[in-house]
UniProtKB/Swiss-Prot annotation:
CDD domains: F1-ATPase_gamma. InterPro entries: ATP_synth_F1_ATPase_gsu, ATP_synth_F1_gsu, ATP_synth_F1_gsu_CS. It is found in: Cell membrane. HAMAP family: ATP_synth_gamma_bact. It holds the Pfam family ATP-synt. This is ATP synthase gamma chain. Keywords: ATP synthesis, Cell membrane, CF(1), Hydrogen ion transport, Ion transport, Membrane, Transport. It is a peripheral membrane protein. GO terms for biological process: proton motive force-driven plasma membrane ATP synthesis. NCBIfam families: ATPsyn_F1gamma. One of its GO terms (cellular component) is plasma membrane. Belongs to the ATPase gamma chain family. F-type ATPases have 2 components, CF(1) - the catalytic core - and CF(0) - the membrane proton channel. CF(1) has five subunits: alpha(3), beta(3), gamma(1), delta(1), epsilon(1). CF(0) has three main subunits: a, b and c. In this bacterium the a and b subunits are transcribed but do not seem to be translated, thus the ATP synthase consists of the alpha, beta, gamma, delta, epsilon and c subunits.
Amino acid sequence: MAHMRDLKRRIRSVQSTQHITRAMKMVAAAKLRKAQAQVTAARPYAAKLEEVVGRLMAAVDPETQPLAATREVKKAGYVLITADRGLAGGYNANLIRLTEERLREEGRPAALVAVGRKGRDFFRRRPVEIVKSFTDIGDNPELIQARELARQLVTMYLEGTLDEVNLIYTRFYSAIRQVPMVERLLPIATPREKKDTGDYIYEPSPEAVLRVLLPRYCEIKVYRALLEAKASEHGARMTAMDNATKNAAEMIDKFTLSFNRARQAAITNEIVEIVAGADALK
């Protein structure tokens, strides 16, 4: 009987957990739909802006632009974008692992800009310099947040605190596929091949346009990374909670089968005892 009571307690416990994971899956699915729509809307704008910047950069000497001029990299910076919360499968762990690999391969001083509690809390316990940290981005990143982050990154780059800035985030492909990646932000990459700019007349000069456009370009690149990361987080959490719900169902079936077998054995033992008692009275 004690074994049966223990099985019933386990079944109730797993059922309670299953209700929670199912609810979290539904919440994550709702948030994912909105985040996915934001990513889909932002990608064409970011791609067109990158095309415009590339065409302008091809028309000027990159060394005249402070955000594109190359210099010796004495200290590299990595902007790690993780989540503020867990229960998202391997989402945070994969980003942290990629960051550790890059820091090991760097072979020169490096610093971290941590966006999200999970990455910040992990590297606080490691011998890694965290120059800035940003948390509470929310489920729907806003452009004003990206603008502030980009402004501080540009300032650190121009002041020489960082000689190179890279974004580490997860690119969103689908609810079941998100890929961690490293993407350079600063200095802004210049086209390898000169593009034909004969069809364009710039007023004012390309140099003047770029001085205004490049900071904006950094803002949009950071904003897109935040959107991609948030959609990936929701997708990873939805998948993780779906798997947890399925695993809970399997555990409930397993415990229920064990409970039924134990109950059947108990009933059989009672019948045997009754028959044995009846035989003894004859």
